[in-house]
Regions:
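Short active-site loop/helix that positions an aromatic residue
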Residues: 2-17
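A generic structural motif
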Residues: 15-29, 52-56, 205-209, 213
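C-terminal catalytic or substrate-handling cores of phosphate/nucleotide-
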Residues: 25-193
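C-terminal accessory/interaction regions of large nucleic acid-associated machines
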Residues: 175-252
């Protein structure tokens, strides 16, 4: 159906009156629990299907989407080629990354750095349910996304100040993007602040201050303990990242 829609949009003068679309209706009245979801999974094979595509069927995602809509936020839970983020729009991937960085759980953040696809592999448990569960409100999701965007803006500005796109400083800012966000949010105690259930935004000056402190501590810790490590690999290593995170947080 989406293909037909795209064709019509590109060829508005073409008549679609004679098009036939095969349709199958399955009665679920006496079907087992979750049978409809399983049928959907088994039959969606006409295009490349990823676990991420079934997030839109998660009741928690639908609830969060509804709560965000009441806040004037468009939360996209379906994968779309035309999606574009804005001040009032974000998708489930951005929400997942932001929630991970706010979680205080370095193992989750390391997995996100390695690839969010692994988290979508188990939509019934694991890290996915740690991030998206009945206790996570739409307001909370919106707050962590906005804070993560602030952190990213500062990080991008710091990266642009560097005279070279190489070296330890550059590698730390680029490869350590998720670790930096985790450290900043932990330093701000964002999870506890946002968990109060109210819309809150940290002042830019406070975020910038904690960012600078976190980046400095991260550089010092890496220089002291992992000077010979390749940063691209280090920030995907859960054991090393947990050691770095715990060492830094012990000084905060």
């Amino acid at each position: 159906v989406s293909t037909i829609g795209r064709f019509k949009k590109s060829n508005p003068e073409t008549s679609m009156d004679s098009i036939k679309v095969p349709l199958r209706v399955i009665q679920l009245a006496e079907a087992p629990v979750n049978f409809g979801t399983e049928v959907t999974r088994a039959n969606n094979r006409q295009n490349k299907i990823e676990n991420r595509d079934f997030v839109s069927q998660d009741p928690e995602q639908i609830r969060i989407q509804s709560e965000l809509r009441m806040e004037g936020i468009d939360y996209s839970i379906m994968r779309s080629e035309t999606f574009s983020a804005s001040d009032t729009t974000f998708d489930v991937d951005e929400a997942l990354v932001s929630l991970a960085c706010a979680s205080g759980n370095c193992s989750i953040v390391t997995q996100v750095k390695g690839g969010v696809g692994k988290i979508y592999e188990n939509l019934e448990g694991g890290y996915y349910k740690t991030l998206f569960n009945p206790n996570v409100t739409g307001v909370y999701v919106n707050c962590v996304v906005k804070l993560n965007r602030k952190i990213e803006k500062i990080r991008n500005a710091e990266t642009s100040k560097l005279g070279s796109y190489s070296g330890k400083d550059y590698g730390t800012l680029v490869h350590g993007n998720r670790m930096i966000a985790l450290l900043v949010m932990s330093g701000l105690k964002a999870k506890d602040v946002f968990a109060k259930g109210e819309t809150f935004s940290f002042p830019d000056e406070e975020v910038e201050k904690v960012f600078s402190q976190s980046l400095l501590r991260l550089k010092e810790t890496l220089a002291e303990n992992y000077s010979d490590n390749t940063l691209g690999s280090l920030f995907k290593n859960s054991t090393k990242c947990n050691a770095v995170y715990n060492k830094i947080m012990a000084t905060v």
